[in-house]
Amino acid sequence: MVKRFSFLAALLVASPLFAGVATEKFDWHPVNGVQEIHVESDRVVVSSLEFDMGDRLKPLQASSAKAVARVDNNGFLAYEVGVAIAVFDGDGNIVAAGSGGVKLGSLGKGERDTFTIRFPYVYRSLTNAKTFIVTLETRERGSKSKPKPASQ
C-alpha cells in the first residue's frame, strides 16, 4: 500500500516537461550565403540559415551582419521559439554570436517564420568562420515556469 501511495505521489509531483532544447554543430559551408541545416525540438525545426556578412555601421562601430533562420512548426501545438547561433574560427574562437526568436506571441502549429539573428558587435573576423553551433529552444505556449521557493 505504501508503495502505491509513494508512486502516486511521485507521479503527481512530477511536472510535465513544457520546454525543449536542441543544439547541433555544423561545418561552415554556406552556398551563396545559405546553408541547409536540421535542428529539431518538439517537432519545431530550424531548416536553413541565410548568412549576411553585413557592413560596418559608422559612427556606431557596429555591424549589420546577421543570419536569418527559417523555422517550421511541424507539430500540433503552438510554441514560443528562440534560436541562438555562435560562429567559430579554426582555433575555436567565437567570431560572431547572437540570438533571436518569436517576434510576438508564438509560432502556431503548421506555421513557418523567419527569425533574424544579429551579430552587431562580435563580427570583425566572421570571414574566418569554420564551424557554428545552433541552439533551438522551444516552450509550449501558455506554459509557465514554476518559481523556485525562496530559501529561508
Model-based region annotation:
Residues 1-4:
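Positively charged n-region of N-terminal signal peptides that target proteins for export
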Residues 14-16:
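N-terminal signal peptide c-region/cleavage motif recognized by signal peptidases
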Residues 20-62, 146-152:
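Transition segment at domain starts
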Residues 23-26, 120-152:
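Terminal connector regions
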Residues 63-69:
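Structural beta-strand segments of beta-rich domains
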Residues 71-75:
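Asparagine-centered strand-capping/turn motif at beta-strand->loop junctions
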Residues 76-91:
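Short acidic, flexible loop segments centered on an aromatic residue
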Residues 93-130:
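Short, solvent-exposed, Trp/other aromatic-anchored flexible loops in extracytoplasmic proteins
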